[in-house]
Amino acid sequence: VPYIQYDEHQAMAQWRDLNQSRDWTAIHLLRNGKRVEANARHCPATMALLDRLPQPDIPGAGPNAMFSLLAPNTTIPPHVGVNNSRLVCHLPLIVPEGCWFRVGAELRLWERGQAFLFDDTIEHEAANPTDLLRVVFIFDVWNPALSEVERDAVRRVIGTEGGAEGL
């Protein structure tokens, strides 16, 4: 599924090249707090691991977990997330040499199996300047700085049973 899916009337110029594109796709296991059974059933060990993590259980918004596939010679433009109630974990699985990721002023090359957490409200971008596919497993965890009372407040403010458009 294309990761960026905006209607044409929405003003999202930074996503023009990737909107509805197969250059950046996602295989969602969890999307806006709902299990995507068609995909999750093929990944029982991954789902069991996710169940043991402190995921942001926010109705209609989280948790989220997906395999992010970036086509050869594709760049994800600089962008930011919408709130820091959760952190995002990236676990590189298939990362051809030369693929990179930037958060704020820190640029790093992907290393297979070397996960890292970051606050995606900080500007970030990624690139696959190679001729091979790049695959990273991405999932959310609660920001550890939040108390349970604060998590409940986040659930009430952000959560919707009808389904928000993610965190």
What are these regions (language model features)?
Residues 93-112:
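A short beta-strand-loop-beta hairpin characteristic of the jelly-roll/cupin
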Residues 96-98, 121-123, 132:
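A generic structural motif
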Residues 66, 90, 125:
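Short, surface-exposed charged micro-motifs
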